[in-house]
Every structure is written in structure tokens, then in C-alpha cells.
Swiss-Prot record:
GO terms for biological process: bacteriocin immunity. One of its GO terms (cellular component) is plasma membrane. It is a multi-pass membrane protein. The lineage of its organism: Bacteria, Pseudomonadati, Pseudomonadota, Gammaproteobacteria, Enterobacterales. It comes from Escherichia coli. This is Colicin-N immunity protein. The keyword Oxidoreductase does not apply. Its main location: membrane. Keywords: Bacteriocin immunity, Cell membrane, Membrane, Plasmid, Transmembrane, Transmembrane helix. The chain crosses the membrane at residues 66-84, 104-124.
């Protein structure tokens, strides 16, 4: 049995995430795309953190106290999207049934997940820049 180069790359990069048996190569490519969101958000934060400003009257302890629940929420959402395997084809939820029918809908799903993770990671990093 001969594996093509694409199959070898996909096998090497098989990351947990959303997968569809209807179009595995597209699904794997989008899954890889979604997994680049944390790197992109962290890079943006590193290059722009000096221009970001928080309210000067906030104490670091108060900021930690307020932001801890949000941090837990963001981390749990990121975990659900990046570190768990979900097969879209086998799901019986109506939304997923609609999404898995067309590649365009799958693209919008992955794109929404990407930007959700990107924004949440950036928002997660901003308050902690002075702490």
C-alpha cells in the first residue's frame, strides 16, 4: 500500500479537532489552519503589547481577581476547540448536519472557530501584560 506525500503529511500532522469524513483533506487542512490561531494571536500580542493601554487605576491584584473566571472560560473554550476530537459526519445535531453537507459551510465553521480562538487568546493575554 503506497501512501502519497499528502497522506503522509496529514498523518504526521493529525491534530485533534473537528473532522469530516465527507472531505478528509479539506477537513485536515482547515484543522491545521485553526491550530495556527494561538500562534498568530500570541505573535500579534508580542508585537503590539507596548501600544496596548489598560486603565491606570487598576491594581494588579484586582485585575487578577476579576480576570480569573474569564481566563478559566477562555482556556476551556480553547481546549474544546483545539484539543478534542469531534467527527462532524457522525453527529446528529441539526447544525452540524447542515454544515457537513457543503464545503462552503465547513469553511465558515472553521473560519469562525479560528477567529474565536484568535480573539480569545489575544483577550486572554492583554490584561496580564503588566502583571
Amino acid at each position: 500500500m503506497h501512501n502519497t506525500l499528502l497522506e503522509k503529511i496529514i498523518a504526521y500532522l493529525s491534530l485533534p479537532g473537528f473532522h469530516s469524513l465527507n472531505n478528509p483533506p479539506l477537513s485536515e487542512a482547515f484543522n491545521l489552519y485553526v491550530h495556527t490561531a494561538p500562534l498568530a494571536a500570541t505573535s500579534l500580542f508580542i508585537f503590539t503589547h507596548k501600544e496596548l493601554e489598560l486603565k491606570p487605576k487598576s491594581s494588579p491584584l484586582r485585575a487578577l481577581k476579576i480576570l480569573t473566571p474569564f481566563t478559566i472560560l477562555y482556556i476551556s473554550m480553547i481546549y474544546c476547540f483545539l484539543l478534542t476530537d469531534t467527527e462532524l459526519t457522525l453527529s446528529s445535531k441539526t447544525f452540524v448536519l447542515i454544515v457537513k453537507k457543503r464545503s462552503v459551510f465547513v469553511f465558515f465553521l472553521y473560519n469562525t472557530i479560528y477567529w474565536d480562538i484568535y480573539i480569545h487568546i489575544f483577550v486572554l493575554l492583554v490584561p496580564y501584560r503588566n502583571i
